[in-house]
Design a protein with these regions (language model features):
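An internal, D/E-rich "acidic patch" concept
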Residues: 2-20, 77-133
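Charged, compositionally biased N-terminal leader segments and the immediate start
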Residues: 8-45
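Alpha-helical transmembrane segments of integral membrane proteins
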Residues: 18-22, 32, 38, 108, ...
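Hydrophobic alpha-helical transmembrane segments of membrane transport/permease proteins
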Residues: 34-85, 178-199
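Membrane-water interface segments at the C-terminal ends of transmembrane alpha-helices
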Residues: 41-48, 78, 89, 153-184, ...
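Conserved protein kinase catalytic domain
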Residues: 45-46, 54, 58, 71, ...
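Hydrophobic aliphatic residues
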Residues: 45-49, 57, 61-62, 91-92, ...
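Alpha-helical transmembrane segments and their lipid-water interface positions
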Residues: 54, 93, 166-167, 224
Length: 336
């Protein structure tokens, strides 16, 4: 009797909650391993870049003794394992070292650049997610018709076009030919909201184009599956109005995978904007990494790249957690 009761409790809400905790814990552990491997790759990549750190700072004509002294001061002459251990320990504590170019803490530059990239990414996110969901749902409700085919073709075409190609086309059309929008995304610190949006419009559009196809396809697939589900047929047989069936039964289940995809893409929007930010002279994390690589500013480069890795990994972790927490069936199935 006691065995039966304990088994039923384990299979009840408490057991389900424990499975969710184990699932999330496993994902967190895998994310930490991923970040550790990324830190090793980033550190090794910085060490493999050509050029001497001291000479890159002091110049090619610097006295060799001054170069050696600077390398010793920066710790560049220590064993690689010692350098890595000290570097990753400081990074975890929020200390990314001093920039070789500006001789100021890297963390302040990375924090400011990340905030700018987040602004650009969130702006693109709040534009593309409603458009992608609306397009995908509308296509699913007209499956097989010309509207469905048109949305699918537009979404696929926008997805496969590289960001730098769409950025250049937008610059030529709206910045050079029509002169409707400024090419430079940089705006004065005291600029109003309209001026800010005007300067950010061109950098946002390539991101909207790229991610519209992903989100629209996921929304369409989820909606088609939900429309064919038994609970939807039951709701229709009960005589519920079409708009009630769509909003109460179809969308609630169809948008679960779309939400997780959108959360994952948000991480990329914030951290993967090197090309867009460079083309539009936007002071984000992508352009910071590009400029650091050109200047051989290793602390800035390593801090920026690892920060992007953290953002993307956390976004994936949040997406996985949302998918499990919002889907009761997957909550049990994925945890077992």
């Amino acid at each position: 009797m006691s065995t039966t009761v304990s088994t039923s409790v384990a299979r009840g809400p408490r057991g389900s909650a424990m499975r969710v905790v184990r699932f999330v814990g496993t994902r967190v552990g895998l994310s930490l391993i991923t970040l550790w491997l990324l830190s090793v790759i980033v550190f090794a990549g910085g060490q493999l870049l050509p050029g001497d750190i001291g000479r890159a700072i002091l110049g090619p004509l610097a006295d060799p003794r001054a170069v050696a002294a600077l390398n010793h001061q920066l710790g560049a002459d220590r064993p690689l394992l010692t350098q890595y251990t000290q570097w990753i320990t400081r990074f975890v504590q929020g200390d990314m070292g001093l920039s070789y170019t500006y001789r100021e803490p890297v963390a302040s530059f990375v924090g400011s650049a990340l905030a700018n990239s987040a602004k650009l990414g969130f702006l693109a996110f709040i534009v593309v997610v409603p458009l992608g969901i609306a397009g995908g749902v509308w296509a699913a409700m007209h499956a097989g018709r010309w509207l469905d085919r048109t949305i699918s073709i537009v979404g696929l075409s926008a997805t496969v076009v590289p960001e730098f190609v769409s950025s250049i086309v937008l610059i030529l059309v709206f910045g050079v030919w029509l002169q409707w929008l400024p090419i430079d995304a940089t705006y004065p610190p005291d600029a109003g909201i309209f001026t800010q949006l005007k300067h950010l419009a061109l950098p946002v559009l390539p991101l909207v184009f790229v991610f519209f196809g992903y989100i629209a396809r996921m929304a369409r697939a989820g909606t088609v599956e939900a429309l064919d589900a038994d609970y939807t047929r039951t709701a229709i047989l009960k005589g519920l109005p079409p708009h009630i069936v769509i909003f109460r039964h179809v969308l609630r289940n169809a948008l679960l995978p779309t939400i997780t995809v959108a959360a994952t893409q948000l991480g990329y929007m914030i951290g993967g904007l090197v090309v867009v930010e460079t083309l539009f002279h936007y002071q984000g994390i992508g352009s910071l990494i590009y400029n650091a690589a050109k200047a051989k500013d290793f602390p800035m480069l390593e801090g920026g790249v690892l920060t992007i890795g953290v953002v993307y990994t956390v976004a994936n972790l949040v997406a996985d957690a949302l998918y499990v927490l919002l889907n009761p069936r997957l909550r049990v199935r994925s945890a077992e």
